[in-house]
Amino acid sequence: MAVCARLCGVGQSGGCRRRRQRKGAGNDPELEDEEEEDEVRIEAEVLVEGQAAVAPLRPRSLLQLPPEILVEIFSSLPGTELPSLAQVCRKFRQILTTDTIWKRRCKQEYGVCENLRKLEVTGVSCHDVYVKLLHQYRHILGLWQPDIGPYGGLLNVVVDGLFIIGWMYLPPHDPHVDEGMRLKPVFRIHLMERNNATVECMYGHKGPHNGQIQIVKKDEFSTKCLQTDYHRMSGGRQEEFRTWLREDLGRTLEDIFHEHMQELILMKFIYICQYDKCLTYRRIYHPPNRPDDLLNPGFFKGTYGSHGLEIVMFSFHGTIAKATKITGDPNVPAGQQTLEVDLTRPVQLPDVEHLRNFDEISRLILDVQSQIQREQRQTGNEEDDGKGAGPDRAEHSQQPAPVHRPAKEDVNGVDNADDREQKPPNVQSFVLPAGVMARNEEYPRSCKMCFYGTGLIAGHGFSSPERTPGLFILFDEDRFGFIWLELKSFSLYSRMRDRFQHSEAPSLEAFDEMLQHMQSWTT
């Protein structure tokens, strides 16, 4: 009745009161249905020349509306409200069996645009698709990070036609950082005729096979393969390793000459094989976007030396920008903060000739580091003396340096092509200093801005982690780089241009809390 009352714009009718009075009297079911129809009747009155008069040409109740009008009304309501509406009366229940209503709910709420004829062939109704597939598994849509030790990953669960598919995002083959991501299906869910939804594992080369999905708790679910023999190959582990090496890394055994790289690759394969039966996923969010950000936050793929390409999430936190690893390695695992950029510490690059000199770049970066250390010591001394820094004693400006931004950009951080063609002001020439190693020599030769930053380095097993100084280089809206001063190494990052739905954080606090939890997942 509450739903009916909202539709009608009135409160409870007298029929509701009569039902309460007769409750427990053992009324006949047919009589109760008639009373239900009485309850939704609306006396439509209009004022004519100051007196109340009944409008003879207008329906006196919702039940008198043509069925196609009721279908249109019900189609505009959220699918979660329709079961309550079906309890109002018998006619409403009959109207709600119309598949057109559920087809619209599937399209508007989940983007399903399949032809009804495809459903008729399989004997599945739009109501079945909504209730048994989309609504039942709505909680797993969005972005997730698999719990694969230090390696992590990025999973995007989407509605794809009449399927729900979990796509694992793999970086392009090293060192081609500007190429698009590679997508690999790991599971799918669909309806078989009118039965419940079927979960299938997509690992291996023998086709889909039986699997399970369990929602462990809020923002966490797990998958389980029930036929792991589908993952095995006739040539045994050696054939599986060669296939994985070729498909995931774009390599062959003959390509790998460096002994250390051979060990890293073999270690990763052995580790991943332990998770081919059961795997747990934890929800992650796309970083929130603010108008004054240096560039649109989002996901980037970057070069990490012998570890290959890894995925990072770039986000802004006041005057600090952070890059958090979505995929990782045995040294610095997924979930850790790989870069931290101080947006209040811009660095002016010298001319190209001086820029080629590593000692010159090193001096610029270390000068900023020394200044920060002096200010920290001064602040500590003032606090010991009981003075405190105070707002009027700030050591340097707490406002990030201004930067030119395109007028319009995509919600997922992908800028428009017309905006990219606009030449931003104050472009600086850029070249890597001599002696700095780079996996990809095809880096931009001009940049917009540079800032002091720190990068996280560690020994094997994330032992003795420390932040080391470096230089953050903003090339354009889709690319940035980082010079690791201590390692004499350069990482180039390129934006992932994929669009993600169901990925927005409910609040800034929820996003910050997620970042904190990510660091604990792999430590």
UniProtKB/Swiss-Prot annotation:
Binding site for Zn(2+): C201, H209, C225, H231
Gene Ontology MF annotations: ubiquitin-like ligase-substrate adaptor activity
Domain of life per record: Eukaryota
Disulfide bonds: none
Biased composition (Basic and acidic residues): 386-396, 406-423
PANTHER family according to UniProt: F-BOX FAMILY PROTEIN, F-BOX ONLY PROTEIN 31
Family: Belongs to the FBXO31 family.
Subunit structure, interactors included: Part of a SCF (SKP1-cullin-F-box) protein ligase complex SCF(FBXO31).
Protein's UniProt name: F-box only protein 31-B
Source species of the chain: Xenopus laevis
